[in-house]
């Protein structure tokens, strides 16, 4: 299955949640597309679980096979499977770049990582799904620092609310991973227990 590259607002409306952040088009019409969009259909338990999974997949830009692998790994780890799942998604490299304010959207962050603009602990890393660890140091590659995009990112650095588990060094745009996040620190509108129930069937 190919990755969805169409209008994010359409998906946000279908799932009734802003997947982009600050999506004015969604705020104007926060109901599913189509003439009957305003009339909510009766939602079964399965549909609610499926919608929650779709919400997580579209939020983090993950396809079904990879998402299932995340679930399997989360289920193996100690603690709550749902919490573990969200932490695994949140610690993807592309998401960390987005959370640090170096990209306006996760989709944009994924592109920047894929194009090889970052190093992790001094090594070039172009895999968006790379999982960061505590004490990792993420830098913009030397040849990429003069790009107009990163210069603009530096100018607007104060606009982003960087989560407490990360730190951005303003002069170099270096990202420091002080710790792995806890579920309470992750502000995504997910009911992950519904996803756990879906995969547990």
Curated annotation (Swiss-Prot):
Signal peptide residues on this chain, from the entry's feature table: none
A biological process term (GO) from this entry: ribosomal small subunit biogenesis
Example GO molecular function: rRNA binding
SMART domains attached to this UniProt entry: Ribosomal_S4, S4
UniProt-listed Pfam families: Ribosomal_S4 (PF00163), S4 (PF01479)
InterPro entries with a match to the protein in the record: Ribosomal_uS4, Ribosomal_uS4_bac-type, Ribosomal_uS4_CS, Ribosomal_uS4_N, S4_RNA-bd, S4_RNA-bd_sf
Alphabetical UniProt keywords: Ribonucleoprotein, Ribosomal protein, RNA-binding, rRNA-binding
Taxonomy, superkingdom: Bacteria
Annotated PROSITE patterns: RIBOSOMAL_S4, S4
Disulfide bonds: none
Domain S4 RNA-binding: start-end pairs: 91-154
Xref: Gene3D superfamilies: Ribosomal Protein S4 Delta 41, Chain A, domain 1 (1.10.1050.10), RNA-binding S4 domain (3.10.290.10)
GO CC terms of this entry: small ribosomal subunit
Function: One of the primary rRNA binding proteins, it binds directly to 16S rRNA where it nucleates assembly of the body of the 30S subunit.
Quaternary structure and interacting proteins, as annotated: Part of the 30S ribosomal subunit. Contacts protein S5. The interaction surface between S4 and S5 is involved in control of translational fidelity.
Family: Belongs to the universal ribosomal protein uS4 family.
NCBIfam families given in the database record: PRK05327.1, rpsD_bact
PANTHER family in the cross-refs: 30S 40S RIBOSOMAL PROTEIN, SMALL RIBOSOMAL SUBUNIT PROTEIN US4M
Protein name according to UniProt: Small ribosomal subunit protein uS4
């Amino acid at each position: 299955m190919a990755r969805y590259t169409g209008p994010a607002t359409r998906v946000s409306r279908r799932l009734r949640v802003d997947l982009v952040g600050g999506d004015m088009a969604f705020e104007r019409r926060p109901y599913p597309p189509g003439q009957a969009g305003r009339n909510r259909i009766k939602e079964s338990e399965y549909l609610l679980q499926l919608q929650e999974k779709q919400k997580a997949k579209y939020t983090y830009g993950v396809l079904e096979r990879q998402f299932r692998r995340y679930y399997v790994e989360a289920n193996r780890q100690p603690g709550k499977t749902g919490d573990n799942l969200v932490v695994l998604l949140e610690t993807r490299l592309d998401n960390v770049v987005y959370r640090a304010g170096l990209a306006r959207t996760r989709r944009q962050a994924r592109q920047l990582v894929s194009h090889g603009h970052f190093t992790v602990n001094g090594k070039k890393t172009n895999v968006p799904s790379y999982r960061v660890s505590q004490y990792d140091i993420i830098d913009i590659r030397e040849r990429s620092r003069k790009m107009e995009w990163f210069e603009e990112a530096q100018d607007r650095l104060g606009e982003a609310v960087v989560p407490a588990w990360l730190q951005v060094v303003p002069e170099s745009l270096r990202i420091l991973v002080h710790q792995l996040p806890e579920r309470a620190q992750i502000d995504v509108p997910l009911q992950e227990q519904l996803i756990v129930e879906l995969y547990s069937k």
